[in-house]
Amino acid sequence: MATADLTVIGLGNSELDDYAQAAAAEQGRSLRPDAEPEKGFYYRSDHFNFAKQGVPALDPDSGVEYVGKPADWGAKKRDEYTEKDYHKVSDEIKPDWDLTGAVDDAQLLTMIGYRVAQADKYPEWKAGSEFKIKRDEMMKGTSSRSSMP
């Protein structure tokens, strides 16, 4: 099912979010931050190992504003899934799931990847990001790892 939004875990940390914002706008969609940052998803996701090394990485998640559904429908479905299935034996694709919105997400992520690949410079962390220092050191060639004996 298509959404009018896309959740970005850690939204606002890097210039990748600017790429995501532009791509989402072209699709007539918006970005929204993680609704539950206190759960630490940013620090538990696959992209975190890139971030720890100073490499900006995008962590997209499904939106919650489903086209043609009441405003709270997506959040209710997410909560229902988390309670009943998340990390349980039943955590599998269900035959009644409508995955057509995944095409929009895949196209958005492809646009981002293409634009990053065509850009003149690598995406950077934004001021205030805890990973910016590591990236700045890396780009200068003076990271603590490279200076080790």
Place the predicted regions along the sequence by residue.
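Metal-dependent peptidase/peptidase-like ectodomains
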Residues: M1-E83
